[in-house]
């Protein structure tokens, strides 16, 4: 089958897709193991790593919204951050299917967390939840129109969030794939003066740069996804 730069996002182009399943399972189980194991211990690498992850996510939540006031939200975001980060990083390995770059994956988390935040806000204070649909100082005649606009914009939040994650991961992987392919082709077509050990070193250095860029994109997009979910708590009722 003819392969192109978008074939890495097509599950049917992976004849060995079953190799990705252990890594998916590991990416799902590691956050639970790190966050809930060795709870009563105050020493050890697992406890230190858990403290580091929790402190980072707690600071992220504290600076972006009112998530610390919601019971269980920091723990959910800590596990989600670790899982998406590991899946983003695992998608950079050869022959591993990038499941985090799929629309359904991100949409399931974005929709479920956004729905829980909306329901929690309405249950906490139904009046404040409805008042958030009307901007401050809005003329009375425009209230029905603004309510419809706010409802539509609110319901589009999960869609825009997952599109941002999927498109950015996809665009980054496509660009890096094209650049790395051009690098390999250029090295293979180069003259004998720059081949040999020097050419191999240049190829390895170029591959290292592109690999570091892929890791940076995976980390940044995971952080942006979780930060935007935290910002949705700004509209939560007090």
Swiss-Prot record:
It is a multi-pass membrane protein. InterPro entries: ATP_synth_F0_asu (IPR000568), ATP_synth_F0_asu_bact/mt (IPR045083), F0_ATP_A_sf (IPR035908). Keywords: ATP synthesis, CF(0), Hydrogen ion transport, Ion transport, Membrane, Mitochondrion, Mitochondrion inner membrane, Transmembrane, Transmembrane helix, Transport. One of its GO terms (molecular function) is proton-transporting ATP synthase activity, rotational mechanism. Pfam families: ATP-synt_A. It is found in: Mitochondrion inner membrane. Belongs to the ATPase A chain family. PANTHER family: ATP SYNTHASE SUBUNIT A. Mitochondrial membrane ATP synthase (F(1)F(0) ATP synthase or Complex V) produces ATP from ADP in the presence of a proton gradient across the membrane which is generated by electron transport complexes of the respiratory chain. F-type ATPases consist of two structural domains, F(1) - containing the extramembraneous catalytic core and F(0) - containing the membrane proton channel, linked together by a central stalk and a peripheral stalk. During catalysis, ATP synthesis in the catalytic domain of F(1) is coupled via a rotary mechanism of the central stalk subunits to proton translocation. F-type ATPases have 2 components, CF(1) - the catalytic core - and CF(0) - the membrane proton channel. CF(1) has five subunits: alpha(3), beta(3), gamma(1), delta(1), epsilon(1). CF(0) has three main subunits: a, b and c. This is ATP synthase subunit a. The lineage of its organism: Eukaryota, Metazoa, Spiralia, Lophotrochozoa, Mollusca.
